[in-house]
Amino acid sequence: MSLSLGDIKFPDNWDLIPNEKNYIDYVYKESIELEVWRPNNKRDLMAHNNVVSLAKYFWPHVDFNRLVMGGELMVWFFSFDDVLDAGIYTDEKQMDLVKRMDNVFINGTVESDATGPEKMALHLRKKCEVMCGKRRKDTFNRFISSCVQWVDSIIPFNKLRSAQGTSPHLELYSYLRKVNIGAYPCVTLTEVMLDHEIEYYIWSDPKWIKMNEDIAIITTLINDLVSYEKEVNDQAGDLNPLYFLQNQKNIPLPDSYKQVVDLIDFWVKDYQTMEQSLLNEMEFKDSKQRSDMEFILEHLRYLASGSKKWSMQTPRYCSPTSPFIEMRTKPSTPVMNSTKKQKIDHVPSQSFISTPIDLNN
């Protein structure tokens, strides 16, 4: 049976060329120093290279320092989430870890026995606080709030399985997963990276909020598709819609896949409608403000299209037996990150941000 991710269609202006990959080693050294990863551990190194490479797809138009921040966010995401997903801690211990991580972001402090993910979180928080300064305190607060929101979503989402006993309805799953997927911290980190002059009211505009939700759901569904084989093999398919739709509706895999693709197409169209409506209502005071907004919108869309591109090359999900032809690899052949860049017609409105980060201020 062969399915194709080519059935997922995005508008041309969602296409991207991944950023450079030289930041990956830099973030790895940081992660060793912060005790996220173990020195000279091949498994940790492989995990690092897989997950941190996602940043170059999410932020293709930022400079090295900001790309490093994206890599740090990925390290924090995966290392903290994996701890809670592993099933090695009691409910009480998991709640304690969540409370400790919330404290890192809210108060900017860590315990004396801080874990690696907690140290990485504090490290990134300090960078964001410096970059935002006093003038953009609201931006910093949005980033902090989105990170706390994500941390607080992990246990409730994991409880979907045990609380229900069976797979959840797709609507309930999507509602919780759009927070749990981690898209919002990526969006707010993009705002941190950009020294923008966008009007404050935009961030509370219902259209902007709905656009964020649309992209989060699209990204969720893409992640669920590409992780299908891995999750089924790990006995975790009951929280994957590609799997549980087969069981709930008694349909074969191709039909389940078509339903998910149709959902993605629906949310892409909804996003486009919302984006156009938002832009039609906005009155830009100058070209800088217009360029800032275009940059934010580009990188919001890249969360969806970047997820798809990254998934088709990462060893985290690619395998010889993948149901998706684009993700099949030869047995025992590692999938390497491609450095060959594709030609695209869309030229980003703002190719690079290159303002230095001064951590001494």
Swiss-Prot record:
NDxxSxxxD/E motif, short sequence motif: residues: 223-231
Top-level EC class as recorded in UniProt: lyase
Motif (DDxx(x)D/E motif): 81-86
Matches recorded under Gene3D superfamilies: Farnesyl Diphosphate Synthase
Cell membrane is among the record's keywords: no
EC number(s) on file: 4.2.3.160
Regulation: induction: Expression is detectable but at low levels in vegetatively growing cells and increases during development induced by starvation. Expression is highest during he ultimate stage of mature fruiting body (approximately 24 hours after induction).
InterPro entries tied to this protein: Isoprenoid_synthase_dom_sf, Terpene_cyclase-like_2
Catalytic activity line of the entry: (2E,6E)-farnesyl diphosphate = (2S,3R,6S,9S)-(-)-protoillud-7-ene + diphosphate
GO BP terms, alphabetized: sesquiterpene biosynthetic process
One Pfam family here: Terpene_syn_C_2
Key words, A-Z: Lyase, Metal-binding
An MF annotation (GO) of this entry: (2S,3R,6S,9S)-(-)-protoillud-7-ene synthase activity
Biological role: Terpene synthase that converts its substrate farnesyl diphosphate (FPP) into the sesquiterpene (2S,3R,6S,9S)-(-)-protoillud-7-ene.
Domain notes: Contains several highly conserved motifs that are important for catalytic activity including the aspartate-rich 'DDxx(x)D/E' motif and the 'NDxxSxxxD/E' motif, both of which are involved in complexing metal ions to coordinate the binding of the isoprenyl diphosphate substrate in the active site.
Family recorded in the similarity comment: Belongs to the terpene synthase family.
PANTHER family given in the database record: TERPENE SYNTHASE, TERPENE SYNTHASE 2-RELATED
Descriptive protein name: Terpene synthase 6
Organism for this UniProt entry: Dictyostelium discoideum
